[in-house]
UniProtKB/Swiss-Prot annotation:
A GO BP entry: phospholipid biosynthetic process
UniProt keywords, alphabetically: Cell membrane, Lipid biosynthesis, Lipid metabolism, Membrane, Phospholipid biosynthesis, Phospholipid metabolism, Transferase, Transmembrane, Transmembrane helix
Gene that specifies this protein: plsY
Subunit structure as annotated in this protein's UniProt entry: Probably interacts with PlsX.
Pfam families: G3P_acyltransf
Catalytic activity: an acyl phosphate + sn-glycerol 3-phosphate = a 1-acyl-sn-glycero-3-phosphate + phosphate
High-level lineage: Bacteria, Bacillati, Bacillota, Bacilli, Bacillales
Coiled-coil spans in chain: none
Family: Belongs to the PlsY family.
Enzyme Commission identifier(s): 2.3.1.275
Membrane protein topology class: Multi-pass membrane protein
GO CC entries: plasma membrane
InterPro entries the record matches: G3P_acylTferase_PlsY (IPR003811)
Protein name, per record: Glycerol-3-phosphate acyltransferase
Principal place of residence: membrane
Length: 198
């Protein structure tokens, strides 16, 4: 059982390491998104550099990485406590943030983390998504909306009584805020780009 979990966690890391934005940019647009915009491999920079269509595809792919990785114990019929689903999900987040296939320079973990929550706690995902979209509609800042959605997910999870989930989301929230520290500075200075399509 332990060996199976280790193998699934490694597989989850590999799944998380798939650099969706980088590959779509290179294969279909002949662009390395690391050389444009914020230089980040995540969905937000994909929108900025490649456009709405490509950005949407990258977002869905990054979410699916987290969802598929979280459900690996289920897919492989590994009869373990459902909290172990969060373990494989966490490895996908690590893979997305430090991808094997992109020199360990990855995204900010927002979409892949959302995918983990979607697989484990769908209603929490829906609540966080609504908060994200409302904040985005008002502020036009993807970065700010991501951080607020992460904080909201943490607050909501406190009422769910699942301490493993709470701990993971707390770690995700801290990591997301830390990865957005440059964005926070730009927002304060009025230099953060706003979206124009919403």
């Amino acid at each position: 059982m332990t060996i199976n979990l280790i193998l699934l966690s490694l597989l989850a890391y590999v799944i998380g390491s798939i650099p969706s934005g980088l590959w779509i940019g290179k294969f279909f647009y002949k662009k390395d998104i690391r050389e444009f915009g914020s230089g980040n491999l995540g969905a937000t920079n994909s929108f900025r550099v490649l456009g709405i269509k490509a950005g949407s595809i990258v977002t869905v792919m990054d979410i699916l990485k987290g969802t598929v990785a979280t459900l690996l114990p289920f897919f492989f019929q590994l009869h373990v406590d459902h909290h172990f689903w969060l373990l494989t999900g966490a490895f996908a987040i690590i893979g997305h943030s430090f991808p094997l296939f992109a020199g360990f320079r990855g995204g900010k973990a927002v979409a892949t983390s959302a995918g983990v929550i979607l697989a484990y706690a769908p209603l929490l995902f829906v609540a966080a998504l609504i908060i994200f979209l409302l904040t985005l509609k008002i502020s036009k800042y993807v970065s700010l909306s991501s951080m607020i959605a992460a904080l909201a997910a943490l607050l909501i999870s406190l009422f769910m009584g699942d301490w493993i989930l709470i701990i993971l989301i707390a770690c995700i929230t801290l990591f997301v805020v830390w990865r957005h520290r440059a964005n926070i500075t730009r927002i304060r200075n009025g230099e953060e780009p706003k979206i124009k399509w919403m």
